[in-house]
From Swiss-Prot:
Pfam families: YidD (PF01809). Residues 81-152 are annotated as: Disordered. This is Putative membrane protein insertion efficiency factor. Keywords: Cell membrane, Membrane.
């Protein structure tokens, strides 16, 4: 766990690692987003998108570990992957996950859905789609239209 032994000078107030390598990787991801990713808006299988994941990983864990996390995510982003919500390790779980302390329940009788009281988290139904959006849905359709012409 070498990254935890970094001096305090290498981290900012939010706990993000700063340095030339993380700046370089973040700049490369921003160039990718400005050039290529803008053409393929809304086609990522994961939430957050792979480029947003890479930026968050580099900000949170620095250039080396964040770069490794970003490359591992890119290797997971392939046609056979189911996709879904995949946050950067060490970040907040987001609005789709409700966390409770282990052993705590909503009422003294236990959860109504039959789970045991020791379950640490309850997954809220996701609001995003799995896989790429259909041509008539999503951000890309808003940018380029439905492809059906002005009749529809």
């Amino acid at each position: 766990m070498v990254w935890r032994r970094l001096p305090r000078v290498a981290r900012n107030a939010d706990g993000a690692v700063r340095g030339p390598l993380s700046w370089t990787f973040a700049g490369l991801v921003r160039l990718y987003r400005a050039g290529w990713s803008a053409r393929n808006a809304g086609l990522c299988r994961f939430e957050p998108s792979c480029s947003a994941y890479a930026l968050a990983a580099v900000r949170r864990h620095g250039g080396v570990r964040g770069g490794v996390l970003a490359v591992a995510r890119l290797l997971r982003c392939q046609p056979l992957a189911a996709g879904g919500y995949d946050p950067v390790p060490g970040t907040d779980p987001g609005p789709g996950i409700v966390r409770r302390p282990r052993g705590a329940t909503a009422d003294p009788g236990g959860p109504p859905d039959g789970r045991s009281a020791g379950d640490p988290a309850v997954a809220v139904p996701p609001v995003h789609r799995h896989g790429p959006p259909s041509p008539s849905q999503g951000m890309r359709a808003e940018i380029v239209g439905s492809g059906r012409g002005p009749w529809v």
